[in-house]
Amino acid sequence: MPRVKRGVTARARHKKVLALAKGYRGRRKNVYRVAKQAVMKAGQYAYRDRRQRKRQFRQLWIARINAAARECGLSYSKFMNGLKKASIEIDRKVLADLAVFEKAVFAQLVEKAKASLAA
C-alpha cells in the first residue's frame, strides 16, 4: 500500500480553524493550537447563549410590563392574573411592546385587568 501523506488535509483543516478565528486578538488568530481552543470555546459560548437569549428577553419583557403596570397602579403578578381572569391571551412580548410604544392601549388593558380582579 502506498504511503498516505496528510499535508493537503491538514492544511485545509488548519485553514478552516484559522478562518473561524479571524478577528481574534493575539496568538488566538494565527497559532493553530491556540486558535483551535479559542474556536471551540466560542462555539460553547454560542450554544449556551442561544438558550440564555430566550430567558433574557423574557426577563426584559417582564420588567417592562411590571414597570408600566405599576405606573397604572397594579403589580405585574396582579396584572397578569387579571388578564387571565378576563380571558385576554396576549403574550409577554406583545404586552411589553404595547407598554413601551402604545401606552394608551396598555392602560386600557390594565383597566380591564382591574375590573376582572374586582369582579
UniProtKB/Swiss-Prot annotation:
GO CC term, one of those recorded: ribonucleoprotein complex
Alphabetical keyword list: Ribonucleoprotein, Ribosomal protein, RNA-binding, rRNA-binding
GO biological process: ribosomal large subunit assembly; translation
Entry-linked SUPFAM superfamilies: Ribosomal protein L20 (SSF74731)
Coiled-coil residue windows: none
A Pfam family it matches: Ribosomal_L20
CDD domains: Ribosomal_L20 (cd07026)
Disulfide topology: none
GO molecular function: rRNA binding; structural constituent of ribosome
Family: Belongs to the bacterial ribosomal protein bL20 family.
Record's function text: Binds directly to 23S ribosomal RNA and is necessary for the in vitro assembly process of the 50S ribosomal subunit. It is not involved in the protein synthesizing functions of that subunit.
Name used for this protein in its record: Large ribosomal subunit protein bL20
Protein's organism: Laribacter hongkongensis (strain HLHK9)
Gene that encodes it: rplT
